[in-house]
């Protein structure tokens, strides 16, 4: 006999585990809407090139890629930002800017499964397209911080930030081609600093610049005053990157004023190849990996064939975020079981259930053919708090019995008083 199980790296979420995911989704959705963002739902399947073009080395190696019956090369989305960029070009390019969009969906990567890493997982994210200002960057970071504040995690998390534009500008100045830039940044992301510096040395042939790269790549915990000092260095002016340091200084100063906990890491880069400026990740002390991340990608829209449009966004790892929440208590409605004692009571069972569901109770109708003495302890063990018992003789008098399955307190009341009776027994 054939036995089917979940595909390796994927998981079923049942009951409370599914409810936790939905709770995070609704919390994020409500917050994003309050910030003025509109929801976007994009297909799970896109053209392979959409992600391969600027996804970065690691992402390309872990994509689920296949050909359809028309011999088109397609992919399950490994992230959602490129899909939003494609949808923007296709549907929203002529709309007033900036465009604010949020999403929640599954993504797929053929990684080696381990703690905090799955082959199917969920991302909640936002994208702001058409605004290059520091206010846009601050809004995105503020939304991200406030999401974790809603989960009572804001005191525990740290947002790690950097400006990848520092590296980009230097490499652009010395005409290092995009593919090589991508590879160098990939090595830095994997903490292979010496390999990255070796490649830079071969291409730049300038020891002063290599020394400067080493200096900033190894400066992990940078203070605000350090950024201001670096901006005044002669080599910074010579490399035309003073504005990139001053931007980081301005952003950091305002984040401090907003009481957002962050740290500057000049050696930090992100693996996705489309980032051009601000980059950031959310860290939590209980895990070794980031639980959210994002950045500015000012050239991606144009690369996809759209008009030049600055953009910034982030993605939250939903499952990873759940791992760091110790006691997430999802508020559940009161569970009510409706038990009819004869066939004559069936219409009343459904009528009572309709009334209670309108009042946000979670109502189940008993389908078991067992005596009441067995049903009551069974449903108590299943988490039901209240039983509505409808007997034939009671019904003739328009009466029902409401029983608290925990305290065993019960009262008989007229049918129209059912809601008050439930509150009275709880």
From Swiss-Prot:
GO cellular component, one term: cytoplasm
Compartment annotation: Cytoplasm
EC number(s) on file: 6.1.1.21
Transmembrane regions listed in the UniProt entry: none
Gene3D superfamilies for this protein: Anticodon-binding domain (3.40.50.800), Bira Bifunctional Protein, Domain 2 (3.30.930.10)
GO molecular function: ATP binding; histidine-tRNA ligase activity
Keyword Isomerase found: no
Keywords: Aminoacyl-tRNA synthetase, ATP-binding, Cytoplasm, Ligase, Nucleotide-binding, Protein biosynthesis
Reaction catalyzed: tRNA(His) + L-histidine + ATP = L-histidyl-tRNA(His) + AMP + diphosphate + H(+)
InterPro entries: aa-tRNA-synth_II, aa-tRNA-synth_II/BPL/LPL, Anticodon-bd, Anticodon-bd_dom_sf, His-tRNA-ligase, HisRS-like_core, HisRS/HisZ, HisZ
BP GO annotations: histidyl-tRNA aminoacylation; L-histidine biosynthetic process
Enzyme class, first EC level, given as a word: ligase
Family under the similarity heading: Belongs to the class-II aminoacyl-tRNA synthetase family.
Protein name: Histidine--tRNA ligase
């Amino acid at each position: 006999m054939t036995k089917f199980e979940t595909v390796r790296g994927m998981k079923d979420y049942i009951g409370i585990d599914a409810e936790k995911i939905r709770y995070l989704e609704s919390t994020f959705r409500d917050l994003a809407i309050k910030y003025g963002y509109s929801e976007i739902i994009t297909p799970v399947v896109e053209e392979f090139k959409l992600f391969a073009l600027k996804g970065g080395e690691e992402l390309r190696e872990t994509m689920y890629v296949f050909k359809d019956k028309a011999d088109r090369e397609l992919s399950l989305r490994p992230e959602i930002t490129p899909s939003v960029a494609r949808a923007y070009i296709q549907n929203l390019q002529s709309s007033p800017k900036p465009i604010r969009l949020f999403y929640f969906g599954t993504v797929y990567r053929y990684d080696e499964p381990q703690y905090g890493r799955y082959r199917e997982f969920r991302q909640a994210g936002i994208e702001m397209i058409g605004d290059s200002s520091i206010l846009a960057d601050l809004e995105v970071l503020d939304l991200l911080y406030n999401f974790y504040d809603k989960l009572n995690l804001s005191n525990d998390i740290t947002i790690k930030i950097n400006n990848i534009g520092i590296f980009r500008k230097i490499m652009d100045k010395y005409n290092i081609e995009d593919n090589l830039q991508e590879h160098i940044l990939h090595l830095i992301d994997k903490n292979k600093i010496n390999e990255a510096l070796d490649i830079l040395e071969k291409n730049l042939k300038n020891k002063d610049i290599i020394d400067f790269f080493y200096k900033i790549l190894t400066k992990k915990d940078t203070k605000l005053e350090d950024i201001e000092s670096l901006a005044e260095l002669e080599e910074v002016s010579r490399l035309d990157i003073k504005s990139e340091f001053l931007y980081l200084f301005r952003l950091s100063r305002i984040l401090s004023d907003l009481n957002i906990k962050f740290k500057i890491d000049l050696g930090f880069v992100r693996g996705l190849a489309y980032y051009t400026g601000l980059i950031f990740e959310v860290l939590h002390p209980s895990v070794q990996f980031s639980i959210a991340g994002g950045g500015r990608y000012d050239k991606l829209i144009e690369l996809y064939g759209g008009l030049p449009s600055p953009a910034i966004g982030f993605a939250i790892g939903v499952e990873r975020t759940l791992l760091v929440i110790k006691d997430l208590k999802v508020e559940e409605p009161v569970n009510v079981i409706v038990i009819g004692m004869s066939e004559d009571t069936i219409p009343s069972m459904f009528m009572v259930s309709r009334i209670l569901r309108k009042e946000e109770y979670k109502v189940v109708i008993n389908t078991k053919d067992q005596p009441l003495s067995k049903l009551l302890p069974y449903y108590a063990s299943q988490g039901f708090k209240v039983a509505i018992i409808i007997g034939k003789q009671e019904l003739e008098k328009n009466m029902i019995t409401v029983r608290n399955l925990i305290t065993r307190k019960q009262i008989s009341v007229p049918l129209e008083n059912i809601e008050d009776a439930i509150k009275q027994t709880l």
